[in-house]
């Protein structure tokens, strides 16, 4: 129980986590601190904490998912929450029920947290507004909505980088002043958008790289603007953002590289000439990373297209690839989010209303 002694709930003010636009540096520090404590738990023997015993976490995924859904469900179970999974194919949606009525059904069953993924941007926020209008105290956690946001992925990426730069003390100070390159299909990536918010807010200099068809110039303005009344920063500087079209130039002086999947299922037209040509210009390999001048780590939110975003040899190199570490870190980070959201709220009634 020591891992959750004196939890930082007094520093947490969000019922819902829909994106990271309002997050202050203190909010990021709170998540990293709690994730570090959960990450320190032994991986053998009893793995459950009673922190969310009696709570119900419902995962509403309207898009396919391996890592995110499994990670959230494992995180909830490790906190002793009950877990309820939703499958669109076997739900009343096929009979014409609205998404809101489906969500209200799960709230009526006692859901304390709805973890929502949807192909359309704004759906989790709309659900949160509608549930609040109905007087419901159920929290909504965005697990990815269209091209908009994927906050838990950005938080686990932040945690992974902080642990890499300072394994003993993975704090914001470990990130400040670092240079991170994000390369690939930024246009269709909710992960990239969330990482731009989190990284620049925490003092990281970001270099975006990709072809103009997948990285419009407008992204140069996509930085974190501190919300009004934000608490005093924990690190002095805020990160910068620039676009570089040439990958070899972008990699010079980088401290880490994140590559993004080509999301061809979201492309309405041909945006690249071929996968081979894309890999030649923007794919990562050991040889290309020599441009960094040091042994830099590689991240990828998954799923990975081997031989497209990065070579199979690089993906399988444990001295360079942090991809599996990202997966491992997803569990304690999502434990932290669920704990902060659910433990700070009174358990919902059977009807899910306050």
From Swiss-Prot:
Domain of life: Bacteria
Ranges in coiled-coil conformation: none
EC id: 2.1.3.2
InterPro entries for this protein: Asp/Orn_carbamoyltranf_P-bd, Asp/Orn_carbamoylTrfase, Asp/Orn_carbamoylTrfase_sf, Asp_carbamoyltransf, Asp_carbamoyltransf_Asp/Orn-bd
Residues given in the record as L-aspartate binding sites: 95, 190, 261
Record keywords: Pyrimidine biosynthesis, Transferase
Transferase in keyword set: yes
Pathway(s) annotated for this protein in UniProt: Pyrimidine metabolism; UMP biosynthesis via de novo pathway; (S)-dihydroorotate from bicarbonate: step 2/3
Binding site for carbamoyl phosphate: 67-68, 117, 150, 153, 302-303
GO biological process: 'de novo' pyrimidine nucleobase biosynthetic process; 'de novo' UMP biosynthetic process; amino acid metabolic process
Catalytic activity: carbamoyl phosphate + L-aspartate = N-carbamoyl-L-aspartate + phosphate + H(+)
PROSITE patterns xref list: CARBAMOYLTRANSFERASE
An example Gene Ontology molecular-function term: aspartate carbamoyltransferase activity
Function: Catalyzes the condensation of carbamoyl phosphate and aspartate to form carbamoyl aspartate and inorganic phosphate, the committed step in the de novo pyrimidine nucleotide biosynthesis pathway.
Xref: HAMAP family: Asp_carb_tr (MF_00001)
Family: Belongs to the aspartate/ornithine carbamoyltransferase superfamily. ATCase family.
Protein's name according to its UniProt entry: Aspartate carbamoyltransferase catalytic subunit
């Amino acid at each position: 129980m020591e891992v959750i002694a004196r939890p930082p709930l007094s520093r947490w003010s969000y019922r819902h986590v829909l994106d990271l636009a309002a997050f202050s540096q203190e909010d990021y520090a709170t998540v990293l601190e709690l994730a570090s404590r959960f990450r320190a738990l032994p991986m053998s023997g009893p793995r459950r904490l009673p922190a969310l015993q009696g709570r119900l976490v419902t995962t509403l995924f309207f898009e396919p998912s391996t890592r995110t859904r499994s990670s959230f469900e494992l995180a909830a179970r490790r906190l002793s929450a009950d877990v309820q999974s939703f499958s669109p194919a076997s739900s009343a949606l096929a009979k014409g029920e609205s998404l809101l009525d489906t969500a209200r059904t799960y709230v009526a069953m006692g859901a304390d947290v709805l973890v929502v993924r949807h192909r359309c941007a704004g759906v989790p926020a709309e659900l949160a507004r509608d549930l609040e209008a109905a007087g419901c105290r159920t929290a909504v956690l965005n697990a990815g909505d269209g091209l908009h946001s994927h906050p838990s992925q950005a938080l686990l990426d932040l945690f992974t980088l902080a642990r890499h730069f300072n394994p003993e003390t993975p704090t914001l100070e470990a990130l400040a002043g670092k240079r991170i390159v994000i390369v690939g299909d930024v246009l269709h990536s909710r992960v990239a958008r969330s990482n731009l918010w989190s990284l620049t807010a925490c003092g990281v200099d970001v270099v975006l790289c990709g072809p103009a068809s997948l990285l419009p110039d407008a992204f140069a303005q996509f930085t974190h603007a501190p919300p009004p009344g934000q608490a005093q920063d924990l690190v002095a500087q805020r990160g910068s953002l620039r676009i570089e079209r040439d990958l070899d130039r972008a990699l010079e002086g980088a401290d880490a590289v994140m590559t993004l999947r080509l999301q061809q299922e979201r492309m309405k037209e041909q945006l690249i000439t071929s996968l081979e040509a894309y890999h030649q210009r923007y794919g990562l390999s050991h040889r290309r990373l020599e441009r960094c001048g040091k042994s830099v780590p590689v991240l990828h939110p998954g799923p990975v297209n081997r031989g497209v975003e990065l070579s199979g040899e690089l993906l399988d190199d444990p001295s360079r690839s942090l991809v599996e570490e990202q997966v491992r870190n997803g569990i304690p980070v999502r434990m932290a989010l669920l704990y902060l959201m659910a433990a700070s709220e009174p358990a919902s009634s059977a009807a899910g209303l306050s």
